[in-house]
Amino acid sequence: MADCCNSTRRDEFGSSRRQFLARCGMGMGALGLASLLSDEVFAAAQTVGSPAKSTHFPAKAKHVIHIFAAGAPSHIDTWDSKPELTKINGQSLPGQNGVAMASPFKFSPYGQSGIEVSEVFSGIAKHVDDLAIIRSMHTDIPAHDVAQLFMNTGSLRSVKPSIGAWVLYGLGSANENMPGYISLRPDGAANVLNWGSAFLPGDLQATSINTSTPTVEGMIQNIRNEYFNRQEQRRELDLVQKLNAMHSQNLQKDPQLEARIQAFEMAYRMQIEATDAFDLSKEPQNIRTLYGDTPQGRQLLIARRLVERGVRFVQVWAGGWDHHEDIDDRLPASAAEIDTPAAALLTDLKQRGLFDSTLIIWGGEFGRTVTRDRNGNENPGRDHNNEAFSVWLAGGGVKGGTVYGATDPFGAKAIQDKVHIHDLHATILHLLGFDHTKLTYRYNGRDFRLTDNFGEVVKGVLA
């Protein structure tokens, strides 16, 4: 047993749970409370502060896979063809800094819908009849960190729950052995607030997984306890539970510590379920080949396996889109990382009967300028633009083969059927069966919601 337990009886039972756990140095996967709590207690822990697991109206989707293209892809080089920009290439544009830069990439019509898509997304383009492409997105601030938080939490200035936390709050968990909300990232660069729960119960925040390594043990450190078997873990957890009960009787509950203890419980259950979910060697070779043996290929295959196991919201970070220079080379490289895996995901979800119950979202935090941004480099790129960008939806409840909204002839600003971040969030919640104005949580005397006091459902993308 750990050294922290070799103490006097007074210290053992008089210290706070926080002190005990800190001194034990318990890590993710080392402990869990599932071995000593009943299923009823576990269910209660999962639903602390959450509403009944019923939607406001029938849901079209039960799960979400959000492919977040962090860094802000250029809409006019991917989903929003602008032939008029070619006609004025190299010329000054009124109201714009610099000179116009036409897209160096060819656009072609795809599918029965005939929607034009850039050659950099030739794989996803084959599924264009399943996509609803919103070309009139706009946001408030063209700064990466703030805009990413806005896309993921609906808030610019204060710490608010992420959209995945709101979804889990509303729907509840569908698998007691897995977190209901998981964030997959190939590196550790992002702000944790992008998948946090803020003032919602702590167990609603995402479990963040670093997918930079292909092994289960590398992705989820300490998923297996090397020092204690399950019976020994039970004895240690029995002591933790006693301390927990005594502390709860005498002192006010500590929400952060309660969430931590619930995480231990989940960790115990995950030792078997997560090991299976993240083990891609169990997939047939043809499926692994379909996705590709790349970081994004592995991430999206894991995402499908998680949805298959009932995870409500999977956030997939697919960054590298901040192309201030060398856009001719860098943008196709970024697109190539996600094109084949995303196309594979759409194919795979369909063949497994999961497409109609899963909402798939792709998009970044804002768009790019229609003018050149050399940024000290001879090979130009594009600067930030919060007034226009593109997002696409697919899957449950989405009207495929649709283009919604439009930018001006050059792609500088959204001008027709403009869609704000709050509108996108309202639409996502609608597809999951929620009226975004009624999915609320009372905190500090006020009812909060994901969309604040704004947001309209984008009915034009609904099937």
What positions do the PLM features span?
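Ligand-binding pockets and gating/stacking loops
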Residues: 1-463
